[in-house]
Amino acid sequence: MANHDPISDMLTRIRNASEKRHEKTKVPASRMSLSIAKVLQSEGFIAEINEEGEGFRKQLILGLKYTGKHRSPIIRSMQRVSRPGLRIYKNTRGLPKVLGGLGIAIISTSNGVMSDRDARKQGVGGEVLCYVC
């Protein structure tokens, strides 16, 4: 069966693996999923990104991060905002702050995929892909 929303699939795989305390999770590779993974890594939500396979079988292996003695997941919540049936676009002033700045919104802009903080610094808006906190 075809996957009509690969971003939601990626977020769900990360969320499920994080809740089950897995060290790593595999995500089908695409330019968008790699860009989102790089933003998550730069913001400290995931530890590492590796690629495996070739062509259509290419996958990203994401190393998840945990904190404390009981290995609490760093990623507490991931929520898809813009979806194929309802795209959500915001200008620079309309970019959301997630949990008062404790979380991030991942934005797809004309300058590439970036966090809401970077988009504000660069003065660009775009499609709000998801919230992570």
From Swiss-Prot:
Matching InterPro entries: Ribosomal_uS8, Ribosomal_uS8_CS, Ribosomal_uS8_sf
GO cellular component assignments: ribonucleoprotein complex; ribosome
Any one Gene Ontology BP term: translation
Its biological purpose: One of the primary rRNA binding proteins, it binds directly to 16S rRNA central domain where it helps coordinate assembly of the platform of the 30S subunit.
Entry's family note: Belongs to the universal ribosomal protein uS8 family.
Sequence ranges of Basic and acidic residues compositional bias: 16-26
Region Disordered, annotated ranges: 1-28
Record's protein name: Small ribosomal subunit protein uS8
Encoding gene, per UniProt annotation: rpsH
